[in-house]
């Protein structure tokens, strides 16, 4: 089983798909990475040689922030926005959607379950 950036890649998936299991690498970056290293996207993870794994590791570590470093960076960015009190930071602090979505209805993922209020008597 190949291990890159602290993640065990699934055994018999195509490399193009297996690389997306690493936080910070999506489909587009996965294709770009495979082109840079000259590895076929159709190659299965089982069939990787040690040299190919080393080449992938070098490109990933030298080029991008992935996994723990990227998660820490995202958390630090959110903390910074909260500290400076910008609009996005306020939305994060209140647990509301940050990117302009409506909140009169929906937004249940960010707001949590409904808080039922007693109805008006007739």
Curated annotation (Swiss-Prot):
The keyword tRNA-binding applies. GO terms for cellular component: cytosol; small ribosomal subunit. Gene3D superfamilies: 1.10.8.50, 30s ribosomal protein s13, domain 2. The keyword RNA-binding applies. Coiled coil: none annotated. One of its GO terms (biological process) is translation. Residues 95-122 are annotated as: Disordered. One of its GO terms (molecular function) is structural constituent of ribosome. It comes from the Bacteria. Keywords: Ribonucleoprotein, Ribosomal protein, RNA-binding, rRNA-binding, tRNA-binding. Belongs to the universal ribosomal protein uS13 family. Located at the top of the head of the 30S subunit, it contacts several helices of the 16S rRNA. In the 70S ribosome it contacts the 23S rRNA (bridge B1a) and protein L5 of the 50S subunit (bridge B1b), connecting the 2 subunits; these bridges are implicated in subunit movement. Contacts the tRNAs in the A and P-sites. Part of the 30S ribosomal subunit. Forms a loose heterodimer with protein S19. Forms two bridges to the 50S subunit in the 70S ribosome. This is Small ribosomal subunit protein uS13. It comes from Corynebacterium glutamicum (strain ATCC 13032 / DSM 20300 / JCM 1318 / BCRC 11384 / CCUG 27702 / LMG 3730 / NBRC 12168 / NCIMB 10025 / NRRL B-2784 / 534). The gene is rpsM.
């Amino acid at each position: 089983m190949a291990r890159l950036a602290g993640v065990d890649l699934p055994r018999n998936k195509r490399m193009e798909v297996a690389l997306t299991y690493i936080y910070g690498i999506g489909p587009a970056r996965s294709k770009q990475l495979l082109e840079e290293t000259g590895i076929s996207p159709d190659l299965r993870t089982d069939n990787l040689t040690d040299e190919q794994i080393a080449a992938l590791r070098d490109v990933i570590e030298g080029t991008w922030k992935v996994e723990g470093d990227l998660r820490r960076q995202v958390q630090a960015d959110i903390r910074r926005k909260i500290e400076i009190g910008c609009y996005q930071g306020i939305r994060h602090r209140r647990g509301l959607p940050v990117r302009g979505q409506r909140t009169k209805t929906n937004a249940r993922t960010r707001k949590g379950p409904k808080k039922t209020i007693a109805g008006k008597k007739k």
